[in-house]
Curated annotation (Swiss-Prot):
SUPFAM superfamilies: Metallo-hydrolase/oxidoreductase (SSF56281). GO terms for molecular function: exonuclease activity; metal ion binding. Its EC number is 3.1.11.-. This is Exodeoxyribonuclease WalJ. Keywords: Cell membrane, Exonuclease, Hydrolase, Membrane, Metal-binding, Nuclease. The gene is walJ. Pfam families: Lactamase_B_2. The keyword Nuclease applies. It comes from Streptococcus pneumoniae serotype 2 (strain D39 / NCTC 7466). A divalent metal cation 2 binds at D65, H66, D150. Its cofactor is Fe(2+); Zn(2+); Mn(2+). It is found in: Cell membrane. 5'->3' double-stranded DNA exonuclease. May be involved in the WalK/WalR signal transduction pathway. Required for accurate coordination of cell division with DNA replication. May play a role in cell wall metabolism. Binds 2 metal ions per subunit. The endogenous metal is unknown.
């Protein structure tokens, strides 16, 4: 592997479960493990990687679609786990984590940067209905990748932290009209549409217009709802809005889809 940059795969992204894999020459990391341990193992196998080689799992927040398999993997393979203090408390009070050895539990506070081997990782807060949700920007040499889903909006503060990355996983959770006319209870619709909910297709595109820069080469659409979105619609909305903003979509950078049950190719950035 080249010493410059790092490799990544979006193992799964969607309302049913989320997990992101990243490796450098020194570290192999997951962000979230929101599917069963068996499924995570299968997804890693798609990119010829094994869970026993993982050094750590970084956790964004305590919702089940982000932590479902964390405890199982930690008990079986012994990797370190990182989350902020409030998220740890919420996870330990949930039914998903189970017993994890105290030596594996580590604090990664919001708004801090930690070094894992040869990569720096910055945490930043988002606006979501969890106790203290945080996402991450990965930085090595002059390369960076941003994870930004599970937020009701992107504030100026957040946009400043994540601007001009080489790659993004950005939320495109729902189409507003499909959600409004769908079968969800009104209270759930309000929650998704609120500032503590999820970014719509249009919101995700607007966020990218504000944050991408001349370094940006890849934008992945993530956390699509099975019930309230259509992959082709999400993709078209992003591409069309970026094109209308004259931002070089398809030339300077490309837009990619993700899947809730199939890993994206292991990609070097």
């Amino acid at each position: 592997m080249s010493e410059i940059g790092f490799k990544y795969s979006i193992l799964a992204s969607g309302s049913s479960g989320n997990s992101f894999y990243l490796e450098t020459s020194k570290k192999k990391l997951l962000v979230d493990a929101g599917l069963s341990g068996k499924k995570i193992t299968s997804l890693l196998a798609e990119i010829n990687r094994k869970p026993e080689d993982l050094d750590a799992i970084l956790i964004t927040h305590e919702h089940s679609d982000h932590i479902h398999g964390v405890g199982v993997l930690a008990r079986k393979y012994g990797m370190d786990l990182y989350a902020n203090e409030k998220t740890w408390q919420a996870m330990e009070n949930s039914k998903y984590l189970g017993k994890v050895d105290s030596s594996q539990k580590h604090i990664f506070e919001m708004g801090k940067t930690k070094t894992f081997g040869d990569i720096d990782i910055e945490s930043f807060g988002v606006s979501h209905d969890a106790v203290a949700p945080q996402f991450y920007r990965f930085m090595k040499d002059d390369k960076s990748f941003v994870l930004l889903t599970d937020t009701g909006y992107v504030s100026d503060r957040m946009a400043g932290i994540v601007e001009n990355a080489d790659g993004y996983l950005i939320e495109a959770n729902h189409d507003v009209e499909i959600l409004r006319s769908g079968s969800y209870a009104w209270r759930l619709k309000q929650r998704i549409l609120s500032d503590l909910g999820h970014l719509s297709n249009e919101d995700g595109a607007e966020a990218m217009i504000r944050t991408l820069g001349n370094r940006t080469k890849k934008i992945y659409l993530g956390h699509l709802s099975k019930e309230n979105n259509i992959k082709e619609l999400a993709h078209m909305t992003m591409v069309n809005q970026l094109a209308q903003a004259d931002l070089g979509v398809g030339v300077d950078f490309k837009v990619y889809d993700t899947s809730p049950d199939t890993a994206t190719p292991l990609t070097e950035i």
